[in-house]
Amino acid sequence: MAAGDGDVKLSTLGSGGERGGDGSPGGAGATAARSSWVAALLATGGEMLLNVALVALVLLGAYRLWVRWGRRGLCSGPGAGEESPAATLPRMKKRDFSLEQLRQYDGARTPRILLAVNGKVFDVTKGSKFYGPAGPYGIFAGRDASRGLATFCLDKDALRDEYDDLSDLNAVQMESVREWEMQFKEKYDYVGRLLKPGEEPSEYTDEEDTKDHSKQD
């Protein structure tokens, strides 16, 4: 046998000594690597669980603070404990109004607030924060709001001192007026009609009045 062959066999045997017990190369190193990987995984998992626990504690603390102070703040906000004008007024009986009569119900001269849309008069007192003297739509209180709503105008130019028949509005604007009328019917009490000049008011019975209020409720 040549010396070179012997060297090769010895070298092969020597390298075989580095095999693991299962015959795989580098058994001890692989085991150590696996151990390190498992340890790292456990450490990462532990950190994640710790973070989740900390977040849960923070959320729990925030919830307890809200339960203790948040609700109290909501109940003691502006106007809390004070009854709205609508809560202190009896329900208005159905009747018809002239322009002059309607103007009395502007939230300043009387606590009740009325406005007209498309010839219908609505009691909007419960929406006083919108239609009261200081509200964003207070200009419509005690007035015919039809033209202003149809043209999206909140200026005095949208108001008429005389009866407004809306005859100069186009089809789109009139459709807008009708849509506003339906929305007011759904949300507020319909209390009567806005009278045209020379028109006589209708006489409403208690039964008709009760029936109308029942429909709105």
Swiss-Prot record:
Compositional bias of type Acidic residues: which residue ranges? 200-209
Q: Which Pfam families match?
A: Cyt-b5
At the top level, the lineage of the source is: Eukaryota
Q: Which residues are glycosylated?
A: 15
Q: Which GO terms describe its molecular function?
A: heme binding; heme transmembrane transporter activity; steroid binding
Keyword set, alphabetical order: Endoplasmic reticulum, Glycoprotein, Lipid-binding, Membrane, Nucleus, Phosphoprotein, Proteoglycan, Receptor, Secreted, Steroid-binding, Transmembrane, Transmembrane helix
How is the subunit organization of this protein annotated in UniProt? Interacts with PGRMC1. Interacts with AAAS.
List the protein's name: Membrane-associated progesterone receptor component 2
